[in-house]
């Protein structure tokens, strides 16, 4: 028997129900914030991610699915969504005008890492990207969008925020941090590698010993220039004004190299201690890194599998929907197919092609979470009627076929 690859799973039944629920909710909120849909390829040139995600990241260093294709191109399956969207923005020359572009996306991402709960090698993300707006109020709106999504999904969270500074204040901080790191011994191999490529990423290390060495490290948000400090204060003010609780985490740097200024992360204890369920921030330098005109960008990505895991723990009852249409004798099935075809213009209809007793049909309708049950037997056929039962309200009656649209 051929099985799915390790760390990759099929999406069906209850998982598919929750996936659709999450995506529908995210899309509705994103559209309310003025975002439109974009879809980028699953396969990109490796150079895109080496230049955007960064050589110091675990993604580029350890986790990319990469290979040489038949055209001798060095390609990889996309490990994250932002770089591809930025590439599309530049390729379509949208970086050359001054208009603001706001996009949302969702789909599969691929990373070769150890599979665990809420973390797969093929996983799904929902994300948004906003280009052309330098205002910190756009950063705040992006965060508030996530707050609204989690509110609609009834997911509890903790919001962590930080400022990573800009090209004006970051070089001095970087210099101070390198001096501090050089004064300490015992960092893990990942930290030593990151120290030479992007020392700020050392702060992101999950190794407990490394974290203990960083207890007295210089803090990012205490080395900000006046402009970055002002923006960070405005961000906190907006969140407070909108009733959003948050915590300033001075060691929050995000997992990718392209962030600057605002950085944020949403964590939840509902699927394990401090599990990240979404994160993002500002990445003004990324557009220029990818040969675009210097500009502004901010966005977030949300892990769908982790959200599904939280929703499944809540054991939410799957909502009934649609119509189950059936017959007690196969001679009526062709007529029901005609009825189903007309109903499907406005309704979800599941038509059974098997003639069964009423009780068996009702059992099957229940298994399929149908809301409305319609059945034709001999009496119904003679009277141009159907047996109707609302499986939510438990109402039942005979209805004329001519009255179907009115009743439904």
Swiss-Prot record:
It is found in: Cytoplasm. One of its GO terms (molecular function) is histidine-tRNA ligase activity. Homodimer. One of its GO terms (cellular component) is cytoplasm. Its EC number is 6.1.1.21. The keyword Aminoacyl-tRNA synthetase applies. The gene is hisS. Belongs to the class-II aminoacyl-tRNA synthetase family. It comes from the Bacteria. It comes from Campylobacter jejuni subsp. jejuni serotype O:6 (strain 81116 / NCTC 11828). Signal peptide: none annotated. GO terms for biological process: histidyl-tRNA aminoacylation. Transmembrane segments: none annotated. Keywords: Aminoacyl-tRNA synthetase, ATP-binding, Cytoplasm, Ligase, Nucleotide-binding, Protein biosynthesis. It catalyses: tRNA(His) + L-histidine + ATP = L-histidyl-tRNA(His) + AMP + diphosphate + H(+). The lineage of its organism: Bacteria, Pseudomonadati, Campylobacterota, Epsilonproteobacteria, Campylobacterales. This is Histidine--tRNA ligase. The keyword Membrane does not apply.
